Regions:
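Envelope-exposed proteins and targeting segments
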Residues: 3-4, 62-64, 160
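Amphipathic beta-strand/beta-sheet edge segments enriched in Tyr/Trp
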Residues: 1-27, 165-167
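Generic structural hydrophobic/aromatic packing signal, biased to beta-strands
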Residues: 5, 66-68, 121, 164
Length: 167
């Protein structure tokens, strides 16, 4: 019997560990026994990989992607001046991510007039009160910040991706 074992981070949907194994050839009609042998062959390595990923997430944070765009009727774009300093929205967003990503760890995939994608933003596993910190909580923080800039955002979350549309 051949098996594939996979584990995923429930908060983001990101893969933690994947292993493929087979039982080898045995003379038996007992499928359960064959599956058990296949699992036994890979379980130690599977758990070690998963534990290594958990330790990395604890140390370096969880990865999320944040995609900013504009609704068709929006009067804003990434060069619109916002905030007290009247900086371009793209610059204001980068400053916010610099301060609010875990250990200042983020990467910008690209910025155009109508889109900005942070393709790897690290967020903590726990908040300052040691409560679970989820993708949804991070999205809410961004949403509230955009509101303080006088913007009217909408948000959607799919797995580890946050979509923010500025209306």
């Amino acid at each position: 019997a051949s098996i594939i074992i996979s584990s995923y981070d429930t908060s983001t949907g990101n893969s933690l560990s994947n292993k493929v194994s087979n039982s080898g050839k045995f003379e038996t009609d007992d499928t359960g026994r064959l599956v058990s042998k296949a699992v036994d062959k890979c379980m130690e390595e599977f758990i070690a990989t998963m534990n290594m990923k958990f330790a990395d997430i604890q140390k370096n944070g969880r990865s999320v992607l944040v995609d900013f765009s504009f609704s068709e009727n929006s009067s804003y774009n990434m060069t619109s001046q916002v905030g007290n300093d009247k900086l371009a929205l793209s610059d204001v967003l980068e400053e916010w991510f610099s301060t609010n990503s875990f250990n200042n760890n983020y990467h910008i995939q690209g910025t155009t007039n109508l889109k900005m994608i942070f393709d790897d933003v690290k967020i903590p596993v726990k908040d300052k009160n040691q409560n679970n910190y989820t993708t949804n909580k991070f999205a809410l923080e961004i949403f509230k910040y955009l509101k303080t800039l006088g913007l009217e955002p909408s948000k959607e979350i799919k797995g580890s991706t946050i979509y923010l549309t500025i209306n």
